[in-house]
Amino acid sequence: MKEMHIIRYADDFRIFCRTKEDAVRTKEAVTAWIEERLKLEVSPEKTRIVNTRKRWSEFLGFKIRVRLKHHKYVVQSAICDKKVEIERAKLVEQAKNIAKPREKKSCLSEIQLYNSMVLGIQNYYQLATCISIDCREFHRRVMTVLTNRLNTETGSMLKHEGGTITQAEKERFGQSKMIRYVSGIDQMIYPIAFIKNKIPMAKRSIVCSYTKEGRAPIHTCLL
């Protein structure tokens, strides 16, 4: 038996081994077991060995590798390149909708949709160690679109101050200097770049969906 760590989600999984020799043997054994015992096909393109000291390994939208820090290896993770392109395109497109709302849509509803997209990205990818770097790029592209498209002959419609914010918004974004408002709209535009890495921790035993006390931490994490 060789030491290994297995991470699985649905039919996608990663196996981490200490040496290349262990990885080769594990790959052969697992492939044979899946094909012979489970009667399932294994994709040669997706089933490969990656040296995470030299290359990224992608899993569930994250890309992961290790780097040397203070004489030991630590995990470095970020949003994978394909997801960066997809999320950036969605945010930029929604920013255009804020500047020019779609038919039967208001500027407020477009801002609320954009904010929900920001929360979704931040909540999912905040476990990545380089999340702030990726989100700064998103923020830069979005603000370029909003600044250019909300600029009028009488001045910019993009303001630094606006309506009141909720307690949850204050706790999450209250310290940010990147908050912006559209003139005449009280709803703030959430700054996607105002995010930092969250260390992954095991779920507390109190958290569950069946009691009021157990649901409280879940609702708090949503904002």
Each model region followed by its residue ranges:
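Non-catalytic terminal/accessory segments
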Residues: 1-223
